[in-house]
């Protein structure tokens, strides 16, 4: 694994850092961008994911204009409805009930800002199908607390993985970073 001193990961997600390590990349620094992640009125999930990923990168780029800034955002949606990053048991319960027994879409956008004023963005859509969950399964998952801060109250790399019937698309994207697209962007500037 190589440490890239001029690469900053604009994220507070431990999963994204771990996924980067899977492709042999250790950023020189990790900076948690503090932005308002409110969904705009009538904003579609894909557009929201792209906007938030760009805003995260822009926020950090202002502080480090001479560095490469990697940012990402993952959104879970049912239809056109963006599900929140669950902060309360009530939010988590509502999200899990919505995706129980249904297909839902997960959009992840990855962006790389370069010191040369270039921006590379890729958006990946993955369809995930959950089994129909009993109230006992839902309550058990809620009690685990594994939903906290997770988009759509779901973290498939934890015990929620046992509820997944199928994934059509990128597994790593659902966790938080599409590895193929991230590698493709980074390899234009770094020897990975």
UniProtKB/Swiss-Prot annotation:
Record-level GO cellular component terms: cytoplasm
GO biological process: nucleotide metabolic process
PANTHER family, sorted: BIFUNCTIONAL DTTP/UTP PYROPHOSPHATASE/METHYLTRANSFERASE PROTEIN-RELATED, BIFUNCTIONAL DTTP_UTP PYROPHOSPHATASE_METHYLTRANSFERASE PROTEIN-RELATED
EC category name: hydrolase
UniProt keyword annotations, A-Z: Cytoplasm, Hydrolase, Nucleotide metabolism
Protein name (Swiss-Prot/TrEMBL): Nucleoside triphosphate pyrophosphatase
Reactions listed under catalytic activity: a ribonucleoside 5'-triphosphate + H2O = a ribonucleoside 5'-phosphate + diphosphate + H(+); a 2'-deoxyribonucleoside 5'-triphosphate + H2O = a 2'-deoxyribonucleoside 5'-phosphate + diphosphate + H(+)
Similarity comment: Belongs to the Maf family.
Pfam families, per the entry: Maf (PF02545)
Lineage: Bacteria, Pseudomonadati, Pseudomonadota, Alphaproteobacteria, Rickettsiales
UniProt EC number: 3.6.1.9
Catalytic site positions: 73 (proton acceptor)
Function, as annotated: Nucleoside triphosphate pyrophosphatase. May have a dual role in cell division arrest and in preventing the incorporation of modified nucleotides into cellular nucleic acids.
Keyword Iron-sulfur in annotation: no
Obligatory cofactor(s): a divalent metal cation
GO MF terms, alphabetically ordered: nucleoside triphosphate diphosphatase activity
Subcellular location: Cytoplasm
């Amino acid at each position: 694994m190589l440490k890239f001193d001029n690469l900053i990961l604009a994220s507070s997600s431990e999963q994204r850092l771990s996924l980067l390590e899977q492709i042999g990349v250790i950023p020189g620094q990790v900076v948690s961008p503090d932005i308002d992640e409110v969904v705009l009125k009538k904003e579609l999930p894909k557009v929201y994911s792209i906007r938030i990923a760009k805003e995260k990168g822009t926020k950090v780029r202002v502080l480090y204009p001479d560095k490469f800034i990697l940012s990402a955002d993952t959104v879970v949606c049912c239809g056109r409805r963006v599900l929140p990053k669950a902060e309360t048991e009530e939010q988590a319960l509502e999200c899990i009930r919505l995706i129980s027994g249904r297909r839902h879409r997960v959009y992840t956008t990855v962006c790389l800002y370069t010191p040369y004023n270039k921006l590379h963005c890729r958006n990946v859509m993955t369809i995930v199908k959950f089994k129909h969950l009993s109230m006992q399964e839902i309550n058990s998952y809620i009690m685990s607390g594994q939903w906290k801060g997770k988009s759509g109250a779901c973290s498939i790399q934890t015990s929620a993985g046992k509820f997944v019937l199928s994934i059509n698309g990128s597994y790593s994207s659902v966790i938080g970073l599409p590895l193929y697209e991230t590698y493709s962007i980074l390899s234009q500037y770094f020897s990975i």
